[in-house]
């Protein structure tokens, strides 16, 4: 009978909010309220169950013999359907209707996502074909920033390992999925960021979620400070951590410090932020954030997803770029000075953007990485990346470490596009990075602009709408690569200009009349300087330290577990 009461509590709000003592009193009285309650098919069952329980407890019985736990018998199972005497007019919850309504909401607010069938051609980069192979377009929004998806070195190594070791890893890292390719990749990543150790995940979304949630769950009283523009993966991890959190204004050091100062230095803290924010192209003040972290006793968690491969003399990201000369001189070795990169506690990155393959990772001190390896469910309970994938990632890292030409070509092509669009009054959101965000300001217009570029001009640029960006700040996100030279850039600029005219979209002067938005048309705004200087863009591979070419990198013990 106890099961009847439990089921009633799960179904009826009256029973759920009524104490056991109150139910007992109702079962022993005959007032109007009690009589009405007995008429309810749900509350009545709970009251009758309590009556039987009371009678049973009051009767003389033999002492019960203690027995081992046994499986439940069919008689002990409460059949909800038969006991509630469902009427013929009752229907089940309309699951499909609910889902349809939710989807209709997204269609109504123009945030419903349509996927374009775009098949990138390795031998014709940056070309792709649509559904029909003869229907070719130029891709201008890929995150394969350096075109490494077609790199001969990477493809050759992947094919070699695929032929020898097969298509899959065969299991988790703990059960048959750990191999020399995983050890090598983690060793390469640790060497790239000049950290002690690294750990590879299936994606950086998983890495961010797994690491941040674990830190918040395990470190008692941890307080997390998160930039308001952080990626969804970081937001998800912080939410799953259940730790106390503070959201600070984007790249606002004063706001961050005011929040850090609310806690004693002894309170564990973590500052989570990105180096390059992918939808606006802004770059974090990493060094100043490290200063605040040291002042207030906080760990630093830096997401370099949109920066690895793109910045620094060896592609380690913005943290490396901030000490460009020191890292250029030392090559694979750690510089003699304290660098920004060495001050950051944790760096997460991706192998699926500038490196052109797939996967995510985190780097840091040995104990920290071993702790994640030992405790993070997102790492422990998932199948390892295939050997061919990890081999391809290692090949990409080694290739980009030993060359500057792709990063420099990409930066030059980015500047060409930005300058030419600005000359025509196309509203490029100002930023110092490789991202070219073109402000539209309306979801429907952003979708129409993207469709026109694709269907009329054979140019694929994806519209970016809510929730990726705030409502009213919808945009087109353009990402030049080394393969987008002057001729392709000319075609793009002419096409965007044509679309803005055809749809009568706001240009820079129009936004200026409206008071400006996200840096576009803002009176008196300071000029934004690119992070790559003219001197750095003039460098060649001959300026690199020779020790970055095919270096011998020792395998990390922590990748397999450290013996004591």
Swiss-Prot record:
Its cofactor is pyridoxal 5'-phosphate. Its EC number is 2.3.1.37. Catalyzes the synthesis of 5-aminolevulinate (ALA) from succinyl-CoA and glycine, the first and rate-limiting step in heme biosynthesis. Gene3D superfamilies: Aspartate Aminotransferase, domain 1 (3.90.1150.10), Type I PLP-dependent aspartate aminotransferase-like (Major domain) (3.40.640.10). CDD domains: KBL_like. GO terms for cellular component: mitochondrial matrix; mitochondrion. Pyridoxal 5'-phosphate binds at residues 278, 306, 350, 382-383. It comes from Candida albicans (strain SC5314 / ATCC MYA-2876). Belongs to the class-II pyridoxal-phosphate-dependent aminotransferase family. NCBIfam families: 5aminolev_synth. One of its GO terms (molecular function) is 5-aminolevulinate synthase activity. This is 5-aminolevulinate synthase, mitochondrial. Keywords: Acyltransferase, Heme biosynthesis, Mitochondrion, Pyridoxal phosphate, Transferase, Transit peptide. The gene is HEM1.
């Amino acid at each position: 009978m106890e099961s009847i009461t439990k089921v009633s509590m799960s179904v009826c709000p009256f029973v759920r909010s009524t104490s056991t003592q109150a139910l007992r009193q109702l079962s022993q009285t005959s007032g109007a309220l009690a009589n009405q309650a007995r008429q309810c098919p749900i509350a009545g069952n709970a009251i009758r169950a309590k009556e039987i329980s009371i009678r049973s407890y009051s009767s003389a019985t033999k002492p019960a013999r203690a027995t081992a736990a046994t499986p439940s018998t069919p008689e002990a199972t409460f059949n909800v359907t038969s006991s509630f005497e469902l009427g013929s007019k009752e229907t089940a919850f309309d699951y499909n209707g609910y889902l349809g309504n939710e989807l209709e909401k997204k269609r109504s607010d123009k945030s419903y996502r349509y996927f374009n069938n775009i098949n990138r051609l390795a031998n014709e980069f940056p070309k792709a074909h649509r559904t029909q192979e003869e229907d070719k377009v130029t891709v201008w929004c890929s995150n394969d920033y350096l075109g490494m998806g077609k790199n001969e070195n990477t493809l050759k190594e992947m094919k070699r390992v695929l032929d020898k070791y097969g298509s899959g890893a065969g299991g988790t890292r703990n059960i048959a999925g750990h191999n020399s390719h995983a050890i090598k990749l983690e060793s390469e990543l640790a060497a790239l960021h000049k950290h002690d150790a690294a750990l590879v995940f299936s994606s950086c979304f998983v890495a961010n979620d797994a690491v941040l949630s674990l830190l918040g769950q395990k470190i008692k009283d941890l307080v997390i400070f998160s930039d308001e523009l952080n990626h969804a993966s970081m937001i998800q991890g912080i939410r799953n951590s259940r730790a106390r959190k503070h959201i600070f204004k984007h790249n606002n050091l004063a706001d961050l410090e005011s929040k850090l100062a609310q806690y004693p230095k002894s309170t564990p803290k973590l500052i989570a932020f990105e180096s390059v924010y992918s939808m606006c192209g802004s770059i974090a003040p990493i060094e100043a954030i490290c200063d605040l972290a040291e002042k207030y006793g906080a760990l630093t968690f830096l997401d370099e997803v949109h920066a690895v491969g793109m910045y620094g003399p060896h592609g380690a990201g913005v943290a490396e770029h901030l000490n460009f000369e020191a890292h250029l001189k030392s090559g694979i070795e750690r510089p003699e000075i304290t660098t920004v990169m060495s001050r950051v506690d944790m760096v997460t990155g991706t192998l699926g953007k500038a490196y052109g393959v797939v996967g995510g990772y985190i780097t840091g001190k040995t104990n920290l990485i071993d702790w994640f390896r030992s405790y993070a469910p997102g790492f422990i309970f998932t199948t390892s990346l295939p050997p061919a994938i990890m081999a391809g990632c290692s090949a990409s890292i080694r290739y980009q470490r030993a060359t500057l030409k792709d990063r420099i070509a990409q930066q030059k092509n980015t500047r060409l596009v930005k300058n030419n669009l600005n000359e025509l009054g196309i509203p490029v959101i100002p930023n110092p990075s490789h991202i070219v965000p073109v402000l539209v300001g309306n979801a429907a217009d952003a979708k129409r602009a993207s469709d026109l570029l694709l269907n009329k001009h054979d140019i694929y640029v994806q519209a970016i709408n809510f929730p990726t960006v705030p409502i009213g700040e919808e945009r087109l996100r353009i990402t030049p690569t080394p393969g987008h030279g002057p001729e392709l850039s000319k075609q793009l600029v002419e096409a965007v200009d044509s679309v803005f005219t055809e749809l009568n979209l706001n240009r820079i002067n129009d936004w200026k009349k409206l008071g400006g938005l996200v840096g576009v048309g803002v009176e008196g705004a300071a000029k934004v300087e690119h992070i790559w200087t003219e001197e750095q863009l003039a460098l060649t591979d001959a300026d690199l330290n020779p020790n970055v070419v095919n270096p011998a990198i020792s395998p990390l013990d922590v990748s397999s577990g450290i013996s004591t």
